[in-house]
């Protein structure tokens, strides 16, 4: 499974949305109807899955699915 597929799968599971709604341009708040608790839980799940900590400052910048994918790619080097 690719990184993109892993991230999308986590988002579908954490936010309870349909996979067809999730693409790189999807905004967590505007398109996927996530609230702050949803986003906190999503960040925690991503940290656990990819074995690194996401700072609060970085987390605030992750507004779309694509933002998360790009961030993880950068962190993985």
Curated annotation (Swiss-Prot):
The record, for InterPro entries, names:
ACP (IPR003231), ACP-like_sf (IPR036736), PP-bd_ACP (IPR009081), Ppantetheine_attach_site (IPR006162)
Taking the record's annotation, the residue ranges forming a coiled coil are none
Q: Which UniProt keywords apply?
A: Cytoplasm, Fatty acid biosynthesis, Fatty acid metabolism, Lipid biosynthesis, Lipid metabolism, Phosphopantetheine, Phosphoprotein
GO CC terms of this entry: cytosol; membrane
Give the UniProt record's GO annotations in the biological process aspect.
Answer: lipid A biosynthetic process
Summarize what the UniProt record says about post-translational modification: 4'-phosphopantetheine is transferred from CoA to a specific serine of apo-ACP by AcpS. This modification is essential for activity because fatty acids are bound in thioester linkage to the sulfhydryl of the prosthetic group.
What PROSITE patterns does the entry give? CARRIER (PS50075), PHOSPHOPANTETHEINE (PS00012)
Localization, per the record, is:
Cytoplasm
**HAMAP family the UniProt entry points to:** Acyl_carrier
UniProt similarity note: Belongs to the acyl carrier protein (ACP) family.
Explain the purpose of this protein: Carrier of the growing fatty acid chain in fatty acid biosynthesis.
| Protein name (Swiss-Prot/TrEMBL) | Acyl carrier protein
């Amino acid at each position: 499974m690719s990184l993109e597929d892993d991230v999308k799968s986590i988002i579908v599971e954490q936010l309870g949305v349909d996979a067809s709604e999730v693409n790189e341009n999807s905004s967590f708040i505007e398109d996927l109807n996530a609230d702050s608790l949803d986003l906190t839980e999503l960040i925690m799940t991503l940290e656990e899955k990819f074995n690194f900590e996401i700072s609060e400052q970085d987390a605030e910048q992750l507004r779309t699915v694509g933002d998360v994918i790009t961030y993880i790619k950068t962190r993985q080097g």
